Design a protein with these regions (language model features):
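Alpha/beta-hydrolase fold catalytic core
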Residues: 2-6, 12-13, 18-21, 28-72, ...
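Flexible "cap/lid" subdomain of the alpha/beta-hydrolase fold that forms the substrate-access gate
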Residues: 34-47, 58-60, 65, 72, ...
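Conserved HGGG/HGGXW glycine-rich cap/lid loop of the alpha/beta-hydrolase fold
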Residues: 64-113, 304
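Conserved acidic functional residues
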Residues: 78, 149, 327-328
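Hydrophobic residues on the short alpha-helix immediately C-terminal to a glycine-rich phosphate/catalytic loop
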Residues: 89, 158, 336-340
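Short, amphipathic alpha-helical "lid/cap" segments that border enzyme active or binding sites
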Residues: 128, 253, 330-334, 338
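Catalytic histidine-centered segment of alpha/beta-hydrolase-like enzymes
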Residues: 321-329
Length: 351
């Protein structure tokens, strides 16, 4: 297990999500009014999804950087973020000769459903199938996948169910494959509190609240999930614009309701979800990452290491790194992606 030290961004001690939520509530009576640290300057050019392609149920908006014949890396963002999590990572990888694809997930940015009749489905198998559909549309037989949050889950699923399509994997918070059956089981009270937003979305009030206060809600999640990340207003606004997608709220609410068994998926994904419910091992070369100040719910590395049965390394990013390592520690994330591709090419290697 490796530790990567990042220059500290704050002298504040890391607090878990629960502590930050309760502190904000006690201080002001309103979680949205949690104090924000002094912002850092935004100097990174935006990552523009200037390409569009029909892929499965979607017309996917994506950025495409680097040489057309370079080794392909697909970078997958999470909720409630967007492709600009990779605004520094993607150009650095492209400069090293990789072809880098960064798509907006369904319900984000310029990605749209091709039919008004398609269910606005956020179940994990659907999101992962979007990655395969994109690869097929772009005629990409194999790629290295890297992601965090929802993006890491999709990358995990693709690596588990379609290993022949994956050269290597970089997954923040490791093994995130689960099932509705697991989601129905109650957790200890402290763990349940960390998932407060999931239960909020299970209510009509939660859907209405997220619809009305999407940007405020997203900012609160950013602050809670990365309590020592000094993002500024411009950085947040650049990503928040992607949440104005007309299908965003529906996708997010369905995703979290599905996890609890409160919403059904689509029949065409049922067989995939049955496979995922067996918690399949991931055999492709993998580097997992965790930030030492991740305030979002996440598993401990020792709990999931055994799910990766191929070449494997784990890295902890120290120095106040939270839930969004590619944006909070881009150089270290770039190195992890490069090293994962090297694991894939090596005959021997780590386990």
């Amino acid at each position: 297990m490796n530790t990567v030290s990042i220059a500290p961004t704050s002298s504040l001690r890391h607090l878990p999500l629960v502590s930050w939520l309760l502190a904000a509530l006690l201080a002001s009576g309103n979680a949205a009014a949690a104090p924000v640290e002094a912002p850092a300057s935004t100097a990174t050019p935006a990552l523009i999804a200037d390409k569009q392609i029909d892929a499965g149920d979607l017309s996917i908006g994506y950025a495409d950087l680097g040489p057309a014949k370079g080794e392909v890396v697909i970078l997958l963002h999470g909720w409630p973020y967007d492709i600009n999590s990779y605004a520094q990572v993607a150009p650095q990888l492209a400069a090293r000769g990789y072809r880098v694809i960064v798509p907006h997930l369904r319900g984000y940015g310029s990605t749209r459903f091709r039919s008004a009749d398609t269910p606005r489905n956020g179940e994990p198998a659907a999101l992962a199938s979007d990655v395969i559909a994109l690869m097929d549309a772009l005629k990409i037989p194999r790629a290295t996948l890297a992601g965090y949050d929802w993006g890491a889950r999709s990358a995990d699923i693709v690596a588990a169910l379609w290993p022949e399509r994956v050269n290597a994997l970089v997954a923040v918070s490791g093994y995130l494959i689960s099932s509705q059956e697991a989601g129905r089981k109650p957790l200890p009270p402290q763990a349940e509190l960390q998932w407060w937003y999931q239960y909020y979305f299970a209510t009509d009030r939660g859907r209405a609240g997220y619809t009305q206060y999407t940007h405020d809600f997203a900012r609160q999640i950013w602050q809670l999930a990365s309590p020592r990340w000094k993002f500024d207003d411009a950085t947040f606004a650049r990503s928040a614009a992607a949440l104005d997608n007309p299908d965003h709220v529906a996708i997010v609410v369905h995703n979290y309701r599905w996890r609890l068994g409160l919403a059904e998926g689509e029949p065409k994904y049922a067989a995939l979800e049955q496979q995922l419910a067996q918690a399949p091992a991931i055999t492709v070369p993998t580097i997992t990452i965790e930030g030492d100040a991740n305030g979002a719910p996440h598993p401990q590395p020792q709990a999931y290491a055994g799910k990766f049965t191929g070449k494997y390394e784990h890295r902890t990013f120290e120095g106040g790194i939270g839930h969004n390592p590619p944006q909070e520690a881009p150089e270290a994330f770039v190195q992890a992606v490069i090293d994962a591709t090297h694991l894939a090419h090596a005959k021997g290697g780590a386990r």
